[in-house]
Amino acid sequence: MAKITKLEVQKRNKERVNVFLDEDYAFSISAELIYKEGIKVKDSVDSEKLKVLANKDAIIKCREAAIKSIERNLKTEKQVRDKLNLKGYDEEAITKAIDFLKEYNFLDDKDYANKFVKDKLKCQGSNKIRYSLMQKGVSKDVIEEELSGIDKENEKENALVLAQKKVNNLRKTESDTYKISNKLYRFLLSKGYGYDIIKDVVKEAMNFEFYD
């Protein structure tokens, strides 16, 4: 049984507290945990208590890492989970961190998918958007629900804008209409547009002269 002889807030990180046992530095834990557990100088702690504290501290650190991971931009649950896994947190800590983010609406795959679709629709087709969301771990049902709201005419118009610009660039180095149309087809395919849209857009764009 060891005795806590000193609690010292870290100079560089006020959220962490150095714990001294029997006059020697032992470890650091979250200031939040110090408060919640009512830890104070002269408390006696055994190895079991130290294990419990270490586990709870790991959960808090994982939660803080999860919050930090979404500070700059939105992420899906899979993206956050993968990042925390790479940092070495165990499954219990990761699950609790994910639950915390969901509870406070910091993590919502449906909201993410909705914003992603709106953001990418001007430069990508629904097929590429679908694949990207699948790679990010969004469920198939959520993806299809969000994609079902896409106006196909609007998607086609966006594809036509891209196609017209592409044709303009291709004509600067290529005069063969057949080769231009083939390159345009592959370009639109790479952007994730479906056959029906590509067929109509290529036909329209090839009749459209767009010179600087």
Swiss-Prot record:
Official protein name in the record: Regulatory protein RecX
GO biological-process terms attached to the record: regulation of DNA repair
Record's subcellular location: Cytoplasm
PANTHER family to which the protein is assigned, alphabetical: REGULATORY PROTEIN RECX FAMILY PROTEIN
Annotated function: Modulates RecA activity.
Cellular compartments per GO CC: cytoplasm
Species of provenance: Clostridium botulinum (strain Alaska E43 / Type E3)
Coiled coil: none
